[in-house]
């Protein structure tokens, strides 16, 4: 679990706005060269080695978390704002959401939650629940761990901070009080 990410001017009901801003920011992101390079290499290797085929993903090698949820909870994913990132919605509530992906290396569930900090503020908390796929998945995750911790996670944190700051523009809203 990551430590919470505090954001200025947030309230108890801002989690859906945050999710929409994060998803909108994904399509307009400007990542550092190192991040772009790492993802380009990962997606190229995945294509060449068949890591990301439908058979290796959700509904193929891995049953989706959404399929194992109570129907009323699973249905909440239908109302989530679409996104072009590689994750699939599992569920979305007013203060938490889960998104997942699966491929030949892992089954990953990203949980985002909106939590009170005790001083009247709120923060975004993220947990990644990762189940490596066999020995190869464990070795792959061990190999990429330094890249995730030193390059990807700090860049992701900055991207999320920008998404909140730029939410009015990203969500094409003129009301700056969101």
Roles of regions detected by a PLM:
Residues 28-31, 114, 123-125, 149-154:
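Glycine-rich loops and low-complexity Gly/Arg-rich segments
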Residues 34-36, 128-132, 154-162:
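Short C-terminal domain-edge/linker segments immediately following a structured domain
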Residues 72-118:
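Hydrophobic-ligand binding "helix-grip"
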Residues 103-142:
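Beta-strand/loop substructures that line and gate deep hydrophobic ligand-binding cavities in soluble
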Residues 139-171:
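A conserved amphipathic terminal alpha-helix motif
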Residues 1-77:
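Hydrophobic ligand-binding cavity/cleft-lining segments
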Residues 35, 39-47, 137, 141-145, ...:
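Short hydrophobic helices that act as membrane-entry/anchoring signals
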Residues 96-98, 106-109, 116-123, 160-178:
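Short terminal or interdomain "cap/linker" segment that borders an active site or interface and mediates
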């Amino acid at each position: 679990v990551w430590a919470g990410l505090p954001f200025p001017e947030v309230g108890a009901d801002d989690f859906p706005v945050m999710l929409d801003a994060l998803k909108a920011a994904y399509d307009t992101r400007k990542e550092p060269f190192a991040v772009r390079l790492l993802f380009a290499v990962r997606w190229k290797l995945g294509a060449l080695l068949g890591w990301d085929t439908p058979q290796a993903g959700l509904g193929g090698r891995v049953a989706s978390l959404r399929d194992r949820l109570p129907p009323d909870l699973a249905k909440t994913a239908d109302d989530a704002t679409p996104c072009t990132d590689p994750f699939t919605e599992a569920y979305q509530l007013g203060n938490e959401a889960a998104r997942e992906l699966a491929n030949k290396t892992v089954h990953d569930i990203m949980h985002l939650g909106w939590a009170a900090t005790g001083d009247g503020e709120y923060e975004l908390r993220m947990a990644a629940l990762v189940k490596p796929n066999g020995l190869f998945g464990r070795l792959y995750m061990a190999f990429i761990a330094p890249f995730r911790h030193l390059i990807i996670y700090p860049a992701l944190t900055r991207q999320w901070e920008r998404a909140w700051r730029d939410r009015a523009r990203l969500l094409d809203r003129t009301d700056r009080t969101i």
